[in-house]
Structures are given as C-alpha cells and as structure tokens.
Amino acid sequence: MDKFTLPFPSGVLKNWPNLDDVDIVIRPNYGWVLNILPLESVEESSGVARTRIPASYPMVKVRWGLRDVNSNGTVWVENVLDALDEPGEWVLNTKEQKIYLWPHGEKPEDIEAPQLTELIRVEGAIDYDGPHDEPVRGLTFRGLSFTRGDRWPWEKERAGSTLQHDWEMFDRPTAMVRMRGAENIAFEQCHWFDSGGAGIRMDLHAQSNRVADSVIEHLGGAGIVLAGYGPGTKDVNRYNEISRNHIHHIGEILWHAAAVSVWQSGGNRIAHNLIHDVNYTAITVSGRISWTKEGRGDGWRTIRWKEVEQTGGEALLPKPGYRPDWKLRAPFLHGRNNLVERNEIHDVMQKLWDGDAIYISGTGGGNRVRENFVHDCLSENMCEGIRCDDDQHETIIERNVVLRNGGMGVGIAIKGINHVTNNFIVDSTPFFQHRGMISLEAVPVEGSIIQQNILVATKPGLRPFYLKNLTGPPDPRLGETKMDFNLYWNTTDPKWADAHLAAGRLEGVEQNSGLGEPLFRDPEKGDFRFKAGSPALKLGIEPVDLRKVGLRK
C-alpha cells in the first residue's frame, strides 16, 4: 500500500462538500509519529480515501511493538461537523466562509485566528551549497513573550527533507522564533506559549546562541529545535546553550514533538531544564538518516552527497539494503560532543510510544548524558529512561537517577558501544513485558563499560539485565563488556540478582559486583546520597546530589 491511501469502514468518511477543509490525523504503522494529512478524495462505495500529501509510513494499524496499541484508536477525522460534539471544539468551512463553534460558556468569546507561523526571524546570509555562511551576530532578546502562532503544514514536495522519523521539517519556518545563520544570539527570560507550532528553532548555521531562564509551554509542536546541515562536511550548528528553562505541555497537536530536539548539531549544552508533560520524548539527540538516493526514508534529501563522495569515496555510496558502517558515517554525523546534564524530567510519553525521556540515536560520538533526574514517567507507553538507539556509539551515560519508570520499566538501554557508569535505577514499574533495568539491545557492544551502577527493585519478577539483539542474532554477551563493581538489591527477593551474577562471572565479568541495600538517605524525597556503611562506597560508587539538578543557577 502506498502512503496516500487510507481504507476505511463503511460510513466513517464521507465525500463532504468542503473536502479540502478535512484532515486525517493518524499514527501510521508505527507508534512514534503522528501525521496530519489533508484529504484529497473519498470513495464511499469502495471505502478508500486518498490524502493530498503522503503519510510517513503506509496508513495501516500500528503493527510493531510488544503490545497492542491500537485499542485507543490510531486514526481520526478532523474539521467536520459530524465530529463537533463537545464544548471548545470548532469547525471551519471555507466554502461557506463560516466557523462553527461550540463555546465553553453561553456565548463565544475571545475568538482569535493566528496568521503567522514565524513572529521573529534572525537570519544571516546562507550559502546553502557553499562551505561558508555569513551569520548575524550579537543580539539579545530579553523579557519578551511569543504566542498565537500557527502550525506550518506539511509539504508534499519536501518528503524526505525531514529530521528523524518526520519529527520535524528540515529548514522550514515551523517555529515562532527562528534563527538561520546566527551567532551569539541570546533569548533570556522569555515566554513562548499557546501556539500551534514550535517555540524556537536554530537552523543550518547556528553557533554560540543561548536560550535561558525562559518558560516554554502549551505548544502544538516542539519546544526548541537545533537542526544543522544534513550529512556532509559543513558542520556549523554547534556550541549552543539551552539552560534553566521550564518546558512543559509540548506536542499538544503534533504528539511526536520533543521538548528539545537536536539534529546534526554538536557541542551543545542542555542543562538545568525542567521538562514535563510531553506527549513523546523530552530530549532527542539524533542523526538518523536513510542513507539512500532512492527517495525513501527519513531525511534522505538532506544528505550532501557531493561532499560525502569527495571525502568518503565508494564505501559510502548507497547500495540496496545496505547502511554504511558507523565509523565511515561518523565524520558526517555532526550531533557529537553534546552535553545533556542536570535536567529534571518527569511525566513524558503521555500519548505516543517507543520513546524515552532522553534519546540518543544514529549520530556522532562523544555525547555525554550525566546527572539527570528522570522520575515518575509512569505512562504505559514509556520505553526507557535513557536510550542509545540504533547504531549509536561512544556515548557516556553517567551519574543519572532513573526513579519509577513505567512502560517496560527499563532504566537505561544501549544499542552499540557505549558506557553506562554510576547510574541509579530505582523502583521500575513495568506495565507490560519487562526487558531489564539495563538492556543491551544490539551488537556490537565490545568494550562497553557498565560499572558502578545501582539497581534497586521493589517488585518480584524484574530482571537486572536484558541481552537481546532486537534485529536478530547474534545477541550481545555479558563477557563482551567491561561489567563490574555494580550493586543489586531487591526489597522482596534477596537472591534477585544471583543468576545474573553467576552468568556474568562465568564470562569473566561482575567479579566484584554484589548484593546489598545501598542505604540511600531518603530516596522517596530524591535524596540519593549514602548513609554511613553503604556497601556502594566499597565498590567506588559515588553518591548523586540531586540538589544540583533542575532549575538551578
């Protein structure tokens, strides 16, 4: 089935007179994206509709996952009178030039219609195909409010000009504030709220810019987007700072929108933010690209093939069903050396699934995720607290606390060679199949350091570790990692980790790890310092002081 065709049950869709006004809202095939697609035609007799622009994937039920996520619906129709059934809803009929509104009170009040997606653009001279841009420099915006922007619609001719999984458009005016060719620009003590699209984005050439001490709330799209040039040698989106912002209720229209999205952008610092009530992932650092010239998949149009071929030679040319080795692609994946630290994140993954609090995937090395507090993400849709997804390497995940994680109850997952050290994963609360509190879900993992972590379970049946290559054999092995000096405790089963420790020791790892209550001072109140006599101290595990995390100077 193509990406324009939608079969439907009899009577659900109609060939409405104002069909151009009608949208289909759908989770197509996968649970990690939501599309809003205008209808082109409806054949009531055959039960087949077509949309004017393609979906991200074929428009069938969500089919991939550990459980059925279709029961609450995967496709809806919007902007038809048939669906106007509760206060606060409205329908626009452009043929009649009428708005139908069911008001909250006795009469309509404060009706506003946005006219712009962008309110401010800071733009230098962009030479898209050339090696250098001329940025605007040295502006500060302080104490401003931005609101009532519109959502930028998807564009048929720009399919493939997108970030990973179509979570955002590449180089488009989707945010109220946009920097494009900008350096040393600061937005301080500002407020983005009540808008249909994203809050602020930094496109292409964006360096040493700062968004700080601000509030970003109730947006239809993403909170903050950093998106550099596609894979190539032009690496000019970097060294930006996102700090001390309160970001919440994000993705209220486009559910997949992240609070902070970093794509092909490196050396950034994302720190001391408070992020909550997000329908999908809180923070993404990504470089996932369909490495193809065939016109299929995520972001394929963004690849700067002339630069890649001049630098990488034949090894990087696309072949059917082939993705070049990460080490060959890494020089062109500019999402490297980012620092994600001391953020507080809770109540994410409210509607979509297969997402996380912090997500790193398919991008460059040197990213560091440290001293973040991820807690009370108890949505049934939750996957991992922190995840290195497909083909992600050289990431350091250290000194994080993951407390009360729902969904699969997984604290940290890696797919690749990454380091997981001195993290505390406590009180996992899985709603369905539990993989493990730490999961190794792909190969290779040789050389991964997994040391000085504390895993505390309060329920029976949980696993400390899960080792499974989710794309097929061979599976990762404990002995391929440098795994040791970890502490395990289950309040209901003192022998909980015995089998894991025995298996690890047979493979030459976990020689010094052990069982024991870590003696946190007050974990219920977020105090993960140790009491005197904690066995963690003998293992060289350091306490994590959450007083330094979140909205702090």
Give the location of each predicted region:
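Autoprocessing Asn-cyclization modules and mimics
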Residues: M1-I53, P58-M59
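Extended Gly/Ser/Thr-rich low-complexity repeat segments
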Residues: S10-G31, M59-L84, K107-A125, V136, ...
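Acidic, glycine- and Ser/Thr-rich low-complexity intrinsically disordered tracts
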Residues: E40-S45, R52-M59, W64-E86, V91, ...
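Extracellular beta-strand-rich solenoid/capping regions of secreted or surface-exposed proteins
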Residues: E112-L139, E168-E183, M202-L204
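Right-handed parallel beta-helix
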Residues: R137-R148, E183-D194, Q207-G221, D235-G251, ...
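Short glycine/acidic-rich loop motifs that flank beta-strands on beta-rich extracellular proteins
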Residues: D150-K156, T174, G196-M202, G220-L226, ...
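N-terminal catalytic cores of secreted or lumenal carbohydrate-active enzymes
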Residues: K156-Q164, M169-D171, M179-G181, D194, ...
